[in-house]
């Protein structure tokens, strides 16, 4: 009897098994929402919305209508009457949770979601956070760092409210955070860090001043953060962590589109460092050729042009990508899928750590960047050979400057361009 029953049970196809894997991931992510108590993680609730909804979108799954409506309504209650989004209803508005809330609403898409953002009040909040030295405060009397610059500039760019007043001196502040290693720190004098490096680089691109950074040295620093375990570390001599698949991998993805500026800086540097002009300097710069550019700083744009910078985010992913990946994309996919992935859903820092919403979001974002890193256009389907595992592993493409799914970004860009 048992043998007969077993014989009648159909063997699942490869496609069915792959679909079950995707469904288990999506089910796990939905369960994360269902199991969050009302008072849990109250100061980062917009981040929980972003991490979870962005992960679902990356997996190519639609958002449940009730979940979408509840999320928009909740984020409306987090929106401060004077602009910006707080970590929860009635709390202080904060640039980080503003970024998370706006990215969530963009990912949900649709008029109700996008129109819920009070752009005028939000602009006023950003102006209040802007500092004379070019930096931004995260909140009233809060810290001033590169993360604040990125979250403000990113939100202003995607909402089509970026202007000269918000841009003024931002490039100077970020430039002062580039360290002797090449990466960027959170503030002047601190240690280079993967998260701040992505934030600073992305912000400089969005304000049209990326040529002021020492890009060859920055590239040197980032590519050497990919460790023998195949993942990325956040700082020199630290352990690899799955979340840096996006923070460092995203920085490399941005640099991949800046190859012409990198080539120009290296060519210009070679004119300064010669045997006759600087023999002592040349002796101590044997490590890599990009070290020769450490003293080069292009002036960039002294006065920003609002009509140009408002379209930088859109134009950045409209151009064809000329160079191949600048990191080992297959190796990073191996780390994400084999080391960071939990067998029953969710992703983590590394084996032995617990899965969580944050790492699930940024591991998946990094995986998407890897999969499309060989494509000339950001939404061109990659060849199967550059996608580790079955082709059903392929995620949705993201906009590398904003970390939102590409088609949702385009919808938001069209919506806000008409306002």
Swiss-Prot record:
It holds the Pfam family Prenyltrans. The record marks 47 as: Important for selectivity against geranylgeranyl diphosphate. Keywords: Metal-binding, Prenyltransferase, Repeat, Transferase, Zinc. Binds 1 zinc ion per subunit. One of its GO terms (cellular component) is protein farnesyltransferase complex. (2E,6E)-farnesyl diphosphate binds at residues 193-196, 235-238, 244-247. It catalyses: L-cysteinyl-[protein] + (2E,6E)-farnesyl diphosphate = S-(2E,6E)-farnesyl-L-cysteinyl-[protein] + diphosphate. Its EC number is 2.5.1.58. GO terms for molecular function: protein farnesyltransferase activity; zinc ion binding. It comes from the Eukaryota. PFTB repeats lie at residues 68-109, 119-160, 167-208, 215-256, 329-371. Signal peptide: none annotated. Its cofactor is Zn(2+). One of its GO terms (biological process) is protein farnesylation. Zn(2+) binds at residues 241, 243, 359. Disulfide bonds: none annotated. Catalyzes the transfer of a farnesyl moiety from farnesyl diphosphate to a cysteine at the fourth position from the C-terminus of several proteins. The beta subunit FTB is responsible for peptide-binding. Belongs to the protein prenyltransferase subunit beta family. Heterodimer of FTA and FTB. This is Protein farnesyltransferase subunit beta. It comes from Pisum sativum. The gene is FTB.
């Amino acid at each position: 009897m048992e043998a007969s029953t077993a014989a009648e049970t159909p063997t699942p196809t490869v496609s069915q098994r792959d679909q079950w894997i995707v469904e288990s991931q999506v089910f796990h992510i939905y369960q994360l929402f269902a199991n969050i108590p009302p008072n849990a993680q109250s100061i980062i609730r917009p981040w929980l919305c972003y991490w979870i909804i962005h992960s679902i979108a990356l997996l190519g799954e639609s958002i449940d209508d009730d979940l979408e409506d509840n999320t928009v309504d909740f984020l409306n209650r987090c929106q401060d009457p004077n602009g910006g989004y707080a970590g929860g209803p009635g709390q202080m508005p904060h640039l980080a949770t503003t970024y998370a809330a706006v990215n969530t609403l963009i990912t949900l898409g649709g008029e109700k979601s996008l129109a819920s953002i009070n752009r005028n009040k939000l602009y006023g909040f950003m102006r209040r956070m802007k500092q004379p030295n070019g930096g931004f405060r995260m909140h009233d009397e809060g810290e001033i760092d590169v993360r604040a610059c990125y979250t403000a500039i990113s939100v202003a760019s995607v909402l089509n409210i970026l202007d000269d007043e918000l841009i003024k001196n931002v490039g100077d502040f970020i430039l002062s955070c580039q360290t002797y290693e090449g990466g960027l720190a959170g503030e002047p004098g601190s240690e280079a860090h993967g998260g701040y490096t992505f934030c600073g680089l992305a912000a400089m691109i969005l304000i049209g001043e990326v040529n002021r950074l020492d890009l060859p040295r920055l590239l040197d620093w980032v590519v050497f953060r990919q460790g023998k375990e195949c993942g990325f570390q956040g700082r020199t001599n630290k352990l690899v962590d799955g979340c840096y698949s996006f923070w460092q991998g995203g920085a490399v993805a941005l640099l991949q589109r800046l190859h012409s500026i990198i080539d120009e800086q290296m060519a210009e540097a070679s004119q300064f460092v010669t045997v006759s002009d600087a023999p002592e300097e040349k002796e101590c710069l044997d490590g890599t050729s990009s070290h020769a550019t450490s003293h080069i700083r292009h002036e960039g744009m002294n006065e920003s042009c609002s009509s140009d910078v408002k379209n930088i985010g859109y134009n950045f992913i409209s151009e064809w990508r000329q160079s191949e990946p600048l990191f080992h994309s297959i190796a990073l996919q191996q780390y994400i899928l084999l080391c960071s992935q939990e067998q029953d859903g969710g992703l983590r820092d590394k084996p032995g750590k617990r899965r969580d919403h944050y790492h699930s979001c940024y591991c998946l974002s990094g995986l998407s960047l890897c999969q499309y890193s060989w494509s000339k256009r950001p939404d061109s389907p990659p060849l199967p050979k550059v996608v580790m595992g079955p082709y059903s592993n392929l995620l949705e493409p993201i906009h590398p400057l904003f970390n939102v799914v590409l088609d949702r970004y385009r919808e938001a860009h069209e919506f806000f361009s008409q306002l």
